[in-house]
Amino acid sequence: MGRSKKSRKPGALGAPEPMVTRNRSESDVEGRERKRVKKRKGLKSGSRHSDGSEAKQRKAALARDPRLGSKKKIPLIVEPAKKLTKQERKLSNEQELEMLENDAQLNTLLDRIENGENLGAGLQKFVDEKLDRIEHLMGRLGLLEPEDDEEEIFEEAPVASKKKASSDEDLLSQFEDFDLDSFKG
C-alpha cells in the first residue's frame, strides 16, 4: 500500500479530514507541473519591444475619428417644408391654450393674486402676458364670451371685429401661402 497523506485544505470544523491517496505516477505528474510553472515565472522575454507597438496600436485605435466610415444614409433630394393648413394651425392653438391653462406656475401666481398678495413687477408682467395670450387664443378659437355690458353700448363694433377677425385669418393664410421666391431677380 502506498503512502497516505493528509490534505491541507480547510474543511468543516471538527469534521474528520478525508485521507488523500495518490499514486506514484500522479505525484510525479504534479511535481513536473509545479516545476514547469516555477520555471516560467516572470515576464516574457523581449517584452519591452513588443509592448511599445501594442501601445501605439491602442493609441491609433482611440484617436480614429468615429464619424469616418459612417453607414448612415444621406438624402440627396431635399423635400420642401410642408406648410400648415388652417385646421392644423387651429389644432396647435388648442394645444397651446391647453398648455397655458394647465401651467402650474401660472396657476400658483393667480392663486397668490386672489389671496391678495402683491407680486413683483417681473412676476406681474409674466402673469399679464400669459393671460393676454390665453385671451387671444380663446378669441381665435371662438371660445371667448362677449361681455353683456359692452355689447349693449357697442352693438356694431363686435360685428365688425368678427368680420375683421375672420378676414385677418384669411389674410394670414394668404400671406403664409404667398411665394416670395417669384420676386427674386
Curated annotation (Swiss-Prot):
Ranges of biased composition (kind: Basic residues): 34-47
Acidic residues bias (residue ranges): 145-155
Keywords: GTPase activation, Ribosome biogenesis
InterPro entries (alphabetical): YihI
Compositionally biased region (Basic and acidic residues): 23-33, 48-68
Family: Belongs to the YihI family.
Function comment: A GTPase-activating protein (GAP) that modifies Der/EngA GTPase function. May play a role in ribosome biogenesis.
Protein's name in the database: Der GTPase-activating protein YihI
Organism: Vibrio atlanticus (strain LGP32) (Vibrio splendidus (strain Mel32))
Gene: yihI
